């Protein structure tokens, strides 16, 4: 009977070992399947995450481009404002000078009158002094007369009102000036009205 008990114990052990092996194999199989599913899930998650990264990278690149364009636009705006401010400062006297030019023309015409008596001569001398002081004040602001007679005609500085043929002058030279022209710094306020040789 003891043999029989030993045999039963042995068979039970073998059965338990077989069950354990089957269970172990079953667990390994389940683990392998789970691992494969996990790998597939991780791959699809990785693909989704990569898509998201690519999408965010594209948005970042677009945003950086917009930011750089805005920054360049702002720098250009600042430069334009600075140039406008400098031009406004540089040419601030332009409207005043434009208003004074007709008075200068009248002074010049008045001083061309021939004085016959002492009273008229002294009046003309006083007008000439005022005229010179006015010119000096304008010169301090950067106003200067445009030279015309004997110079080559320049459409930016001269306005041709007549043409003549005169062998004493070169072709396209200014022969006579009817009204003086003026510049404020480098900007022509009023062109000279001139007669030009053909």
UniProtKB/Swiss-Prot annotation:
Pfam family, one: GrpE
Top-rank taxon, per record: Bacteria
MF GO annotations: adenyl-nucleotide exchange factor activity; protein homodimerization activity; protein-folding chaperone binding; unfolded protein binding
Protein name (database record): Protein GrpE
Record keywords: Chaperone, Cytoplasm, Stress response
Compositionally biased spans, kind Acidic residues: 29-39
GO biological process terms, semicolon-separated: protein folding
GO cellular component: a single term: cytoplasm
Compositional bias per record (Basic and acidic residues), positions renumbered to this chain: 1-27
Family: Belongs to the GrpE family.
Subunit structure of this chain's protein: Homodimer.
Location(s), subcellular: Cytoplasm
Disordered: region residues: 1-39
Naturally occurring in which organism (per UniProt): Bacillus cytotoxicus (strain DSM 22905 / CIP 110041 / 391-98 / NVH 391-98)
Listed InterPro entries: GrpE (IPR000740), GrpE_coiled_coil (IPR013805), GrpE_head (IPR009012)
Encoding gene (name): grpE
UniProt-listed CDD domains: GrpE (cd00446)
Role, per record: Participates actively in the response to hyperosmotic and heat shock by preventing the aggregation of stress-denatured proteins, in association with DnaK and GrpE. It is the nucleotide exchange factor for DnaK and may function as a thermosensor. Unfolded proteins bind initially to DnaJ; upon interaction with the DnaJ-bound protein, DnaK hydrolyzes its bound ATP, resulting in the formation of a stable complex. GrpE releases ADP from DnaK; ATP binding to DnaK triggers the release of the substrate protein, thus completing the reaction cycle.
PROSITE patterns in the record: GRPE
């Amino acid at each position: 009977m003891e043999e029989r008990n030993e045999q039963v114990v042995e068979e039970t052990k073998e059965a338990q070992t077989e069950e354990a092996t089957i269970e172990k194999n079953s667990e390994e199989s389940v683990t392998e399947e789970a691992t494969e599913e996990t790998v597939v899930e991780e791959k699809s998650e990785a693909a989704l995450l990569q898509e998201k990264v690519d999408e965010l990278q594209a948005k970042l690149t677009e945003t950086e481009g917009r930011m750089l364009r805005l920054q360049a636009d702002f720098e250009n705006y600042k430069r334009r404002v600075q140039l406008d401010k400098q031009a406004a400062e540089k040419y601030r006297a332009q409207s005043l000078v434009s208003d004074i030019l007709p008075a200068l023309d009248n002074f010049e015409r008045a001083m061309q009158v021939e004085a016959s008596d002492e009273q008229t001569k002294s009046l003309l001398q006083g007008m000439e002094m005022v005229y010179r002081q006015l010119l000096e004040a304008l010169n301090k602001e950067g106003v200067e007369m445009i030279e015309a007679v004997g110079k080559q005609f320049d459409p930016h500085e001269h306005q041709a009102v007549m043409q003549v043929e005169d062998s004493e002058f070169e072709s396209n030279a200014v022969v006579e000036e009817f009204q003086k022209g003026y510049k404020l710094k480098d900007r022509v306020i009023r062109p000279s009205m001139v007669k030009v040789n053909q």
